[in-house]
């Protein structure tokens, strides 16, 4: 967190889910590490306060072991959504009650949410959080993640303009 929220003004918020494969191993199969870096830079910049909440919800909430199993199925031709389904897992298993609790504890009721994911927007709004603006965090696809990002746009409704 940078700065101290005052007067109920909407602060920039990034709710970021762990991505060991990109953030630690440097995988290019997604844009998670890029999104985290951009969010940290944005929030550290002028106009503080801002907040990044980092959650341990690897692989859209299915966990690291299941994510690796899904990667193996993707190498065999399935996309990210169909790979989860083939493993009997949900498309997205993340939940945001802890975020609502953190924000309530900090006295934050209004945010400018940094996301491309409409489910995250809806999930947080469901806890009574006022989201006054969606701040996109998008990068041009690379050869390793273009199919993944296209699938997220087409099957999960992600708000991606460069795909």
Kindly give the residue locations of the regions a language model identified.
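Catalytic domains of riboflavin
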Residues: 1-163
């Amino acid at each position: 967190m940078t700065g101290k929220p005052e007067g109920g003004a909407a602060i920039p918020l990034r709710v970021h889910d762990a991505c060991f494969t990109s953030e630690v191993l440097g995988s290019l199969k997604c844009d998670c590490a890029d999104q985290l870096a951009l969010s940290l830079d944005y929030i550290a910049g002028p106009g503080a306060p801002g907040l990044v909440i980092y959650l341990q919800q690897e692989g859209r909430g299915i966990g690291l072991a299941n994510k690796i199993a899904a990667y193996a199925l993707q190498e065999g031709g399935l996309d990210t959504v169909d790979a989860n389904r083939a493993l009997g897992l949900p498309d997205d298993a993340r939940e945001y009650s802890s975020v609502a609790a953190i924000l309530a504890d900090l006295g934050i009721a209004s945010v400018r949410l940094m996301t491309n994911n409409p489910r995250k927007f809806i999930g947080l709004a469901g806890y009574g959080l006022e989201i006054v603006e969606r701040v996109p965090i998008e990068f041009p696809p690379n050869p390793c993640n273009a199919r993944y990002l296209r699938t997220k746009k087409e099957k999960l409704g992600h708000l991606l303009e460069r795909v």
